[in-house]
Amino acid sequence: MTNTNETIFALSTVFGKSGVAVIRISGNYALKALNHFHIKKEIKPRFATLVDLYDDSSQLIDNGIIIYFPAPNSFTGEDVIELQVHGSKAVIKIILEELSKVFVMAKPGEFSLRAFLNGKFDLTQIEGIADLIDAETKMQAKQAIKQISGELERLYSNWRQRLITIQSKIEAYIDFPEDIWAEKSELEKINNEVQSLVRLIQEHLNDNRRGERLREGLHIVITGEPNVGKSTLFNFLAKRDIAIVSEYAGTTRDILEAHIDIGGYPIILSDTAGIRESSDPIELEGISRAKKRSFEADLRIELFPFEQRPNINCNVVNSDTIYVLSKADDVINNHDIKINGIDLLPVSILKGIGTNKLISLIKEKAEEKFGHDRDTPVITRQRHRNHMQKALEHLQRFNIDNPIELISEDLRLAAFELGAVIGIIDVEEILSSVFSNFCVGK
C-alpha cells in the first residue's frame, strides 16, 4: 500500500492565506531538508530554531521555525522535521516545489499510517485522530479525545486477550487430552468465561448507535402543515436565513438542511414541505420527501398553529417528537399547554416566547440519544460494529459439547474480529479503507 522506505512530505495546515503554515517531513532522510534549504545552524532535537530557508539558487524563500523530532520519539516513529513558515500561498508553493526535488509527496493519511505501522497508535486511536480533526462540536471533540487516549483499544485488547487465554487452554487439550479436559470444573470455567464475553459484547452492541450518532449528528426534522412557521423556526435555530419565509403556503418544496450545535451536540436540522392535500406534482414530491425524512429522523419537532389549538388531534404520540404551538404571539406565559393529552410548547419567534425552553428540550433529547457523557467506551464506526457483530456470532456458536477443533476455530475467529478493530491483522484492504479518508499531511 505504501513504501515506508521513502521520505515523505506534505503541508499539514490548510492551503491559503494564514499567519503560519506547517510543513511536515518524515522518513529516514528527513534531515536532508537541512542541506537542501542551506540551513547551517545546529538543530537541537525538540527545540524550535529560527532559520532562513534558501532555494537552489541561494535565493531567500522565507525565514521560519524548524523542529526536529528524532525517531522513534515522533508522531510517525520516524525522523520528522516540521517547518513553520509564513502562511503565504507563494511561500508554501515554493517550499513544496523544493521538497519535491528530494522527497515524495505524501498520500492522504500516510503520516498516520506510518504511525500505526510503527506502533505509535492502534487503528481506533488513528480513527479518533480523524474524528478530532473533523469535530465541529464540544461533545464530538470529547468523544474523539477519549478514543485517541486508547479507551476502545484497551477494551477490545482485554476481550481479545481473554479469548486467547481460553483458546490456549483448549489447544493444550489437543496436545494433552488426558490432562485439562478431564476436569469438569475446568470445562465450566471456560464456558462461563465465554458466556461472560457474550454478554459484554451484546451490551456493547446494544447502545442505540450513540457513538456513531455523535460522529454523524442527530437528525432533527421540523414538520407540520403549510404556513405554520416551520421555515421561521428553522432559520431561528440555524441562526441565519436559509429558508424563504413567506405568507404563501407551500413555499418550501425541497428539504433544506443546516448543521447546528446545541449544547455541544451536533444537530442536522431539516426544514420540510408542509403536509397537506395537493394536486401540484412538484409539491406532492416535496410532501413525499418530507414524510420520508420525518420517518427516518432521530427526533421531530411538530408544529401546530396556536390559533387552531382546540382542534389539534395527534394520532401518534411518541417520545421522539417535540410538539410546538407556533406563532404564539399572544400567549400570556410560556408554560406547556395540554390538549387532548398532548403537552405542547407555545413558541413565538417574533416575541422570543418559548424559544429558550425549546432549545433546552432539544438538548435534553440529544443527551438521551447520545447517552449524556457516558464513561464506558462506545462504538463510533460501522466498521467496529461489523467486526464486533461477527465476533459475537462466533462466540454464540461456541458449545462445549462440540468437537474440540470447532470450539478452537470459533474462538480463533472471534479473536480475529476483535483484532481487526484495533489493527492486529494483516489485511491491507482494511488499512486502505481507514487511511484513505485522511487529509494529506495527516
Swiss-Prot record:
Coiled coil: none annotated. Binds 1 potassium ion per subunit. GO terms for molecular function: GTP binding; GTPase activity; metal ion binding. It is found in: Cytoplasm. It comes from the Bacteria. Mg(2+) binds at residues 231, 252. Keywords: Cytoplasm, GTP-binding, Hydrolase, Magnesium, Metal-binding, Nucleotide-binding, Potassium, tRNA processing. This is tRNA modification GTPase MnmE. It comes from Wolbachia sp. subsp. Drosophila simulans (strain wRi). The lineage of its organism: Bacteria, Pseudomonadati, Pseudomonadota, Alphaproteobacteria, Rickettsiales.
